[in-house]
Amino acid sequence: MEQLAQSGIGLALAAFALTVVATRRVLGYLRQKQIMDLPNERSSHSLPTPRGGGLATTPVLALALLVQADFRFLGIGALALLAISWIDDRKGLPPGPRFAAHGVAVLGLLLLLPGDALVFQGVLPLWADRVLALLGWLWFVNLYNFMDGIDGITGVETLSLGLGIALVGGGTLTAPALVVAAVAAAFLVFNWHPAKLFLGDSGSVPFGYVLGGLLVMLA
């Protein structure tokens, strides 16, 4: 257990440093290309602010998951969602293709769960357990997408949940949960009020997906 915690802390520190470096580069690119989040009634910013920080956070998060055998498919799913979400950030996508991509990524992970790994602890039959887990996970992903655009909120929520999962879950969940928290903390350097950068769909959707997956595994 102690060795798992130590390796998780080391991986998290590396992820924090890499995210800070990558985010600085991405921020310059977004400013150059004028990829901006325009203020609306939900916004806490009054000026156009670069959007697309997920180009930095998601690859670091996915890489840290890919080097852990138990979480490789979660990392692959995060990269797939980065690709579709970046298109949405740049050009906009209708809800159908976006939700379909989210559904495929979530369903793929649920199908990999062993039949005796019941998310709702056996209260429901297997088919109902998986359907409810699918709907809950999709809701969670889209909740994260909705939160983006408000200074600091997504980063603080992600940091808190990551640390909470690491403390409560322990074991093999420690390292990925600490990495999630570390990447979120690094992003907060740029997203704290007044925000210099927002995640965009390319960051908020994969964050919600990965955290949702860890919560399912915790259950």
Predicted regions and their residues:
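"…together with the soluble PPM/PP2C metallo-phosphatase catalytic core" -> "…together
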Residues: 1-219
